[in-house]
A protein has these predicted regions:
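Short phosphate-engaging motifs
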Residues: 22-23, 86, 90
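Conserved active-site tyrosine of GNAT-family acetyltransferases
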Residues: 23-27, 94, 122
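Long, hydrophobic N-terminal alpha-helical segment
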Residues: 13-17
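Vicinal oxygen chelate
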Residues: 1-11, 34-82, 89-118, 129-132
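Amphipathic alpha-helical segments
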Residues: 19-34
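Short glycine-/small-residue motifs
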Residues: 124-127
C-alpha cells in the first residue's frame, strides 16, 4: 500500500435498497452489526473495518447522477466477500437465520471454500474460508 495515496482505504460503501426496514433487520440479524446513524432514508451500520450505508434506492440518484440506480433484477455488478476461519459455523448461523445459500459450500480453484447469498435488496455476499 502506498502511504502517500489516500485512496487505498475504503471507509464506507452505500448499498441501494427498496425496503429499508427489511434491509436493516437483515443486516442486524445476519451480520450482528450495530446502527451508527439512521434517518427516514438511510441506515448506516458498522462492520469491523467498514461502514455500510443502506440507502433507499429512490434517494440514490442524488449520489450517482447522471447515472441511474439499478434495480434488484438488473444483474449483479459486484460481490462483497468476507473471509472467516469457520465456514461451517457461519453456514449454521445463516441457516438459523433462514438465509438461503445460492452456492456452496464449494471448493474454489483459488484455494477457498465459499458460499454465496443475497440480502433482501439482491446484493450478493460471499463468505469464504481458506482451505489448508
Amino acid at each position: 500500500m502506498d502511504p502517500k495515496n489516500p485512496l487505498q482505504k475504503i471507509s464506507a460503501i452505500s448499498l441501494f435498497v427498496e425496503d429499508l426496514p427489511a434491509a436493516k433487520a437483515f443486516y442486524q440479524s445476519v451480520f450482528g452489526v450495530s446502527v451508527l446513524f439512521e434517518d427516514p432514508t438511510s441506515v448506516a451500520v458498522k462492520f469491523e473495518n467498514l461502514i455500510v450505508n443502506l440507502l433507499l434506492a429512490s434517494e440514490g440518484s442524488t449520489l450517482v447522477h447522471p447515472a441511474t440506480v439499478g434495480g434488484p433484477d438488473s444483474g449483479k455488478r459486484f460481490q462483497i466477500s468476507i473471509w472467516v476461519d469457520d465456514l461451517d459455523g457461519v453456514c449454521a448461523k445463516l441457516a438459523a437465520e433462514n438465509v438461503t445459500l445460492l452456492t456452496g459450500p464449494q471448493l474454489q480453484p483459488w484455494g477457498m471454500k465459499t458460499v454465496t447469498f443475497v440480502d433482501p435488496a439482491g446484493h450478493s455476499w460471499e463468505v469464504g474460508q481458506q482451505v489448508k
